[in-house]
Design a protein with these regions (language model features):
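Hydrophobic, well-ordered secondary-structure elements that form the walls
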Residues: 86, 109, 148
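Short beta-strand/loop motif that positions the catalytic acidic residue
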Residues: 86-87, 92-94, 98
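Alpha/beta-hydrolase-fold enzymes
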Residues: 1-64
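Active-site nucleophile elbow and catalytic-triad environment of alpha/beta-hydrolase enzymes
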Residues: 64-82
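Conserved alpha/beta-hydrolase "acid-adjacent" motif
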Residues: 99-105
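Catalytic active-site module of serine/aspartate enzymes centered on a nucleophile-bearing elbow/loop
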Residues: 125-161
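Generic beta-strand/beta-sheet core signal
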Residues: 2-3, 93-95, 124
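Catalytic histidine neighborhood in serine/cysteine hydrolases
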Residues: 106, 110-132
């Protein structure tokens, strides 16, 4: 996985304080507050360039314009229905300084890939390896692609889940 995106909606909710993140599930699952979501997300991007960019990208990805529709669409993209159904060897790269994917999702990814033929998880920590700890290991793509190439060619030992 390049990157370990368990749930696409996480990209928008990561900047929220951790206690508020679960509330997005309620909002995404309930169509009634759509007008409130749309109003709030017309204002909020003015205070956060990161949120503004992420909403713009989400609109582009989904082809939708209303924030409430975008949130519902992103909420549908999750690995949850695939849990236990993936059986091929898997490589997962994860960094604890990822701007879009909460690092704590790694355990969800491991659970989803529990039946993989093999699971090789490479974890990068900002304190030791700041370039590789970023989203999609963007700080050192050559190294990231080398890791993937070596893994695909069997030059790296594959570890179990």
């Amino acid at each position: 996985a390049f990157d370990m995106m368990y749930r696409l909606l996480d990209g928008l909710t990561l900047p929220l304080p951790r206690p508020l993140r679960p509330m997005t599930d309620v909002i995404v699952g309930n169509p009634r507050p759509a007008w409130l979501i749309d109003a709030a997300l017309r204002i909020a991007p003015r205070f956060s360039a990161d949120l503004a960019w992420k909403l713009q990208q989400a609109r582009h990805l989904t082809g939708l314009s209303k924030p409430s529709e975008v949130l519902r669409a992103l909420g549908a993209f999750t690995m949850e229905p695939l849990e236990g159904l993936i059986h091929q060897p898997c490589l997962v790269l994860a960094g604890d300084a990822d701007q879009y994917v909460p690092f704590e999702r790694l355990e969800d990814v491991r659970r989803a890939l529990a039946n993989a033929a093999s699971l090789d998880v490479r974890v990068f920590h900002e304190a030791e390896d700041p370039d590789m700890a970023q989203h999609c290991q963007i700080g050192d793509l050559n190294r990231a692609f080398t890791i993937m190439g070596d893994w695909l060619s069997g030059q790296q030992p594959r570890s179990g889940a």
